[in-house]
Amino acid sequence: CIRDSVYDPAARTVEQVVGGIAGASGLALDERTQTLYISDLGSRCIWSAAASARGLTAGGKGCQSSFSGLPGYPGALALDEDSTLYISYRWAGSSWLERHAGSTFLRGVALRLSESMQENLFSLPADGIRAEAVSTASGSWLWSFSGKPQGSSSALCPVENRVYFGIAGEKALYSARV
């Protein structure tokens, strides 16, 4: 299991924030509410916990699944000033991965494949959802972003009325108006 930790440069220590995550691939901090959001590839969900918390376990007291049943495997996260959480998707949902979700060995093998092999096996379809936006205040889904570029969204950044996307394997930056 992966542990999300925090480094204290003054004390030169690392403290565990959340354990029991099967593939932490993105973090976002809501400074207003001091909530930390963590994308989990293995569980296809977004966990949330207080930013000041230490020693939590995903799904346990103080660390709940805020958004689950996602259409793909979440990657990068970003949060705008209105507390809208943007979730990028690395891969489309995969029946093979879902069937073998209980096997830490097979899941580990899939996560350690080369990026090009992962893209070939689990790539998002041309018209698939690359990213979504959800209100953390209400839990309502605001936007879905789909598009023609092949590859998964490896980075995203909301700026005013646009969202910028980095697509794995592409030599261009994409954007969408919101």
Would you name each region that the model predicts?
Residues 4, 44-46, 93-95, 131, ...:
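Structural signal for beta-propeller blades
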Residues 13-18, 62-67, 140-146:
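A short beta-strand motif characteristic of beta-propeller blades
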Residues 3, 17-35, 69-83, 128, ...:
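Beta-rich, blade/repeat-based domains predominating
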Residues 20, 30, 36-43, 87-91, ...:
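Conserved beta-strand positions in repeat-built beta-propeller and related beta-rich domains
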Residues 22-24, 43-45, 53-54, 71-75, ...:
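Short, catalytically relevant binding-site loops at active-site mouths
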Residues 74-142:
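Loop/turn-rich, solvent-exposed surfaces of beta-rich toroidal or solenoidal domains
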Residues 8-12, 50-54, 135-139, 177-178:
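Short loop/turn segments that connect beta-strands within beta-propeller blades
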Residues 153-178:
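Blade-level signature of beta-propeller repeat domains, shared across WD40, Kelch, NHL, RCC1
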